[in-house]
């Protein structure tokens, strides 16, 4: 856990917007995930929740009215190069992971909200302004399935969304990013958190742990890494590692891939670049 301190860039709040524009009701100051689109000079951050909630037992937190007030409702747009916050979007319901499209002319990203079970699109409009729009439900929102991790296939045609409470993964056709359509659903375990789609789109990897204080109890506290083959219609399990049995602790995140796969998809010609770096 060693490292060198570089800098602090404060997230906008109602009391100090740090020069950003508040586009809606909220400027809560929470920070969670971060993604960038360098060619558009874009950095996005989500807001999820704060330290006090992470330290609470999950069931206790859900029944604590005060704790439930301490969830974020925003995504912030930043100038990537200067780290200046530019715009605060209302994305109510605790947005977690942000994933940006891979295509060089696909200027949009997705996030999901844990408490309201929505998929949101963060996109650049025709005027070059970034906007946020709710585009789909995940499962039955009233049952709070709790969307956690998301993963975009490298061809930008499929978005995988995991829900922690029901242990399911869902696939959404995002050929039209403004109209995601669920096309597949499968239970992975009693609980599931992270998902990673391989670069060729033929495999999915899943891990189970959200964080120690929030993972389920008893037999439902499954800790695993599972791998599946995906043929475009169904998932077929290839292997599963029981982290509890192997005394490996909690399975949170995984990165499994091969460098050779990154040439599997030919990139489209770039249009309207704001910035470009040539590596020699």
Residues of each region from the PLM?
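Beta-rich, blade/repeat-based domains predominating
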Residues: 26-42, 92-108, 139-157, 189-199, ...
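Beta-propeller blade signature
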Residues: 4-14, 62-82, 220-232
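Loop/turn-rich, solvent-exposed surfaces of beta-rich toroidal or solenoidal domains
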Residues: 107-113, 117-119, 141-225
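A short beta-strand motif characteristic of beta-propeller blades
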Residues: 17-24, 84-89, 131-141, 181-186, ...
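Asp-box/WD-like beta-propeller blade repeats and closely related beta-sheet repeat scaffolds
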Residues: 1-38
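Blade-level signature of beta-propeller repeat domains, shared across WD40, Kelch, NHL, RCC1
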Residues: 195-280
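Short, conserved, GDST-rich strand-edge loop motifs in beta-rich repeat architectures
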Residues: 1, 46-70, 207-225
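Short loop/turn segments immediately following beta-strands, especially the blade-tip
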Residues: 9-16, 77-80, 121-131, 171-180, ...
């Amino acid at each position: 856990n060693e490292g060198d301190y570089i800098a602090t860039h404060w997230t906008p709040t109602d009391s100090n917007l740090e020069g950003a524009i508040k586009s809606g009701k909220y400027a809560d100051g929470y920070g969670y995930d971060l993604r960038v689109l360098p060619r558009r000079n874009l950095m996005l951050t989500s807001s999820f929740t704060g330290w006090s909630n992470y330290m609470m037992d999950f069931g206790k937190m859900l029944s604590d009215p005060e704790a439930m007030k301490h969830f974020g409702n925003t995504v912030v747009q930043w100038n990537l190069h200067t780290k200046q916050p530019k715009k605060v979007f209302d994305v109510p319901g605790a947005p977690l992971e942000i994933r940006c499209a891979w295509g060089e002319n696909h200027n949009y990203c997705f996030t999901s909200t844990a408490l309201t079970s929505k998929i949101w699109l963060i996109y650049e409009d025709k005027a070059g302004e970034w906007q946020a729009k709710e585009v789909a439900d995940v499962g039955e929102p009233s049952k709070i399935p709790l969307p956690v991790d998301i993963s975009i296939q490298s061809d930008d045609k499929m978005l995988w969304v995991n829900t922690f409470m029901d242990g399911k993964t869902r696939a959404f056709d995002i050929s039209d990013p403004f109209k995601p359509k669920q096309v597949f659903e499968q239970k992975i375990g009693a609980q599931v958190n992270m998902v990673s789609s391989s670069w060729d789109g033929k495999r999915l990897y899943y891990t189970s742990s959200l964080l120690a204080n929030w993972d389920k109890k008893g037999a439902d506290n499954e800790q695993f890494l599972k791998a599946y083959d995906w043929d475009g219609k169904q998932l077929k399990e290839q292997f599963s590692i029981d982290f509890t049995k192997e005394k490996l602790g909690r399975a949170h995140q995984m990165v499994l891939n091969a460098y050779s796969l990154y040439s599997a998809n030919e990139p489209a010609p770039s249009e309207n670049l704001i910035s470009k770096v040539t590596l020699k």
